[in-house]
Amino acid sequence: VLECLYSPIVDSVTPLGEGLLAIRECFLSKLIFQTYSGYVASQFKKMQTDIRNQGRVKWKHVMHLIRLLLSGTAVLTDGVMVVDVGCHRERLLTIKRGEMPFGEADAWRKELQVRFEYAFRMTRLPERPDYERVNAFLVDARRRALSEELP
């Protein structure tokens, strides 16, 4: 859901949507580390299961694991959710196509894991999301919906 708030592709935005986009940073906190760590662990487990059961990896799982580490590190470092993988796109596609040797992909994963953990230790994000501000937005949105102020 957070990725939707940071998507560079927006067709149209209502006034309510503009208000939500204006407070999107309120959703970011150090809890990103816990959330992304869970996603990374899940992808790593899938990768290990593939190796154990089939003797090979599903490259899509490897690519997603690395993409998650890149995204999580960017959020913790810059305080902004980066949806576009930009400069890493070709390298990620090389992994997805199975064209990168597993050892090289795994070395990148390990390097990114170290960076991710360092970014967590150094992040300036708050401990928790700004629940009060988000709740105030939600209450206002519901009030406006009930009074038919919304399109």
PLM feature spans:
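Metal-dependent nucleotidyltransferase catalytic core
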Residues: 1-3
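Conserved nucleotidyltransferase catalytic core and NTase-mimicking acidic/glycine-rich helix/loop elements
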Residues: 8-144
